[in-house]
């Protein structure tokens, strides 16, 4: 998946 999504998830978590 896109690393951008991981960044968004990291902000949420």
Curated annotation (Swiss-Prot):
Tissue expression notes: Expressed by the skin glands.
Modification type Leucine amide: residues: 13
Record localization: Secreted
Keyword Secreted: yes
GO cellular component: extracellular region
Annotated keywords: Amidation, Amphibian defense peptide, Antibiotic, Antimicrobial, Secreted
Keyword Hydrolase found: no
GO terms for biological process, alphabetical: defense response to bacterium
Family statement: Belongs to the frog skin active peptide (FSAP) family. Temporin subfamily.
Function of the protein: Antibacterial activity against Gram-positive bacterium S.aureus (MIC=100 uM).
Protein name in UniProt: Temporin-1Ce
Lineage, broadest ranks: Eukaryota, Metazoa, Chordata, Craniata, Vertebrata
């Amino acid at each position: 998946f896109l690393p951008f999504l991981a960044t968004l998830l990291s902000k949420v978590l």
